[in-house]
Amino acid sequence: FRLSVDDYHRYIYVDNGRESVHRRIPGVLHTVNPVANDVCPIYKENTREYSLLKSEHFGTLLMMEVGALMVGKIENRPVMSHVRRGQEKGNFAFGGSTIIYMTQKDKVFPDMDILINSADGIETKVQIGSRIGKGKN
């Protein structure tokens, strides 16, 4: 999920679970505008932080925050073992940024509009609390 300057720059846990492993990957600060990714591999070069969440409904999730040109500062809350859906995980200091979620195969199924737009290179605007897919029951 890419946040633009006018978005709320706090992010939350998407499910109840147990958080483990927290790592920071130093890097540079390119813009996270999709056009920039055509020029340089921003998801490989930008400053990043990631953690793993063993979630109740979606298996193990990798949650990664990517710093951006106007942000740079990723402010994650101290790691707690048990977390709750909707609990604040952290925030970006200012500007636009990206949040990446990686899931186990066949555990999460994105909604069709997101799949179609992504295949066409179009971002889908989402808001906190809006559905973006479903977990395998």
Regions found by a protein language model. Name each.
Residues 1-137:
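Contiguous, well-folded functional domains in the mature portion of proteins
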